[in-house]
Amino acid sequence: MAAASPVCGSQASAVGASSPPAPAPAPAAGLGRCRMALLLAVALDVAGMAALLTGVFAQLQVRGRDFGDLLIYSGALLVFLSLLGWILWYTGNIEISRQELERDYGLRPSAIARLARKLSRRWSAPATASPRTTAGLRSARRANRAPQPSSSGSRRVRLQLATLEAGSVAAGTGSE
């Protein structure tokens, strides 16, 4: 979420960065660090509730058409969209120490990581091989995947689609 960083400010540098450990951030006072996200959430809540309550209690008619439902639905939509602001504000105020980040997300050898590296190397090996070797591997895979014809007399049919022209359809002839 690169768009969230200007709203909430930078909280910490990357875990693998070689910078000296930064001092612990000061506790957030009052509204927290993400004041713009909080302002967005509160503004959307106020506008949504105003539209929703106006749609419920006011009799809005223009040229005999009732617009109460429009205000109810748009107010509910604004209140729902305010959840984005609340989520940004809440997640922007979570404080995690560098030690906790390194403990939870540090590079530790695990069986899953080894398996992922092994599969990645195996799948990327044909891509780095020469084109002739890669073509040979592809044809070998196709031969293994191709269904074997059964002895019941079935045969393989090749279907080719071609565009039909208006003149050839009317005349009953077509190029095949």
Swiss-Prot record:
Principal cellular location given in the protein's record: membrane
Biased composition (Low complexity): 9-19, 124-135
Location of the region described as Disordered in the Swiss-Prot/TrEMBL record: 1-21, 124-156
Bilayer disposition of the protein: Multi-pass membrane protein
Record topology, Cytoplasmic segments: 1-36, 91-176
Ranges annotated as spanning the membrane: 37-57, 70-90
Topological region Extracellular: 58-69
Protein keywords: Membrane, Phosphoprotein, Transmembrane, Transmembrane helix
One of the record's GO cellular component terms: membrane
Top-level taxon: Eukaryota
Phosphoserine sites (modified residues): 175
InterPro entries, per database record: TMEM238
Subcellular locations according to the entry: Membrane
Protein name: Transmembrane protein 238
Organism placement in taxonomy: Eukaryota, Metazoa, Chordata, Craniata, Vertebrata
Gene for this chain: Tmem238
